[in-house]
UniProtKB/Swiss-Prot annotation:
Organism: Mus musculus (Mouse)
Protein purpose: Core component of the TRAPP complexes which has a function of guanine nucleotide exchange factor activity for Rab1 GTPase. Plays a role in vesicular transport from endoplasmic reticulum to Golgi and autophagy. May play a role in dendrite postsynaptic membrane trafficking.
Family: Belongs to the TRAPP small subunits family. TRAPPC4 subfamily.
Entry protein name: Trafficking protein particle complex subunit 4
GO BP annotations listed: autophagy; COPII vesicle coating; dendrite development; endoplasmic reticulum to Golgi vesicle-mediated transport; vesicle coating; vesicle tethering; vesicle-mediated transport
Coiled-coil portions: none
SUPFAM superfamilies: SNARE-like
Primary location: membrane
Cell compartment(s), UniProt: Postsynaptic cell membrane; Golgi apparatus membrane; Endoplasmic reticulum; Vesicle
Length: 219
């Protein structure tokens, strides 16, 4: 998908909603004999490369799969501990796929808080009063787009640099938030959004944005 992530950050800098479409991208896959010539360590419930960078395998990469079987955190899909499995000579030769790990929930919370602070700094540094703050950050692989409402809620979209119509999409997400979160009698302001209708309509809006590139009248 050309739209990678959607985040909603409350006025205090707390992450109250997040949606991701991307999967961890495999960087390298290699068959190893015993003993393993890489140093692996457990960090934040993930098995990461700590030493032995080689053949496209980099320090910080996570173990994504073993012998074609996906790894979830520190366990394989059939419930075996990764480090224990790789420490057993009887399991070799073994094929391991490495790649950049998906962000954990704690990391997303921390990054949302950091972006909230950067947004405030950007507003304060403006030579003019009433600055909108950060509206877009660009890298070589994605663009971060941000729309802040009058009440301080921030809607953040990470998308492919070539994706058009993100400004319209941000405002559409705001409409969906107003219609299906704020009008929900069971939803409390500033709290995490757990509304099925919000989820459904957000996904529909993202599909429309990717197909059409923008929103027209009546969308």
């Amino acid at each position: 998908m050309a739209i990678f992530s959607v985040y909603v950050v409350n006025k205090a800098g707390g992450l109250i909603y997040q949606w991701d479409s991307y999967s961890p991208r495999a960087e390298a896959e290699k068959t190893f004999s015993y003993p393993l010539d890489l140093l692996l360590k457990l960090h934040d419930e993930r098995v990461l490369v700590a030493f032995g960078q080689r053949d496209g395998i980099r320090v910080g990469h996570a173990v994504l799969a073993i012998n074609g079987m996906d790894v979830n955190g520190k366990y394989t899909a059939d419930g075996k501990e990764v480090l224990e499995y790789l420490g057993n000579p009887a399991n070799y030769p073994v094929s391991i796929r490495f790649g950049r790990p998906r962000l954990t929930s704690n990391e997303k919370l921390m990054l949302a808080s950091m972006f909230h602070s950067l947004f405030a700094i950007g507003s304060q540094l403006s030579p003019e009063q009433g600055s909108s703050g950060i509206e877009m950050l660009e890298t070589d692989t994605f663009k971060l787009h941000c729309f802040q409402t009058l009440t301080g809620i921030k809607f953040v979209v990470l998308a492919d640099p070539r994706q058009a119509g993100i400004d319209s999409l941000l405002r559409k997400i705001y409409e969906i938030y107003s219609d299906f979160a704020l009008k929900n009698p069971f939803y409390s302001l500033e709290m995490p959004i757990r509304c099925e209708l919000f989820d459904q309509n957000l996904k529909l809006a993202l599909e429309v944005a990717e197909k059409a590139g923008t929103f027209g009248p009546g969308s």
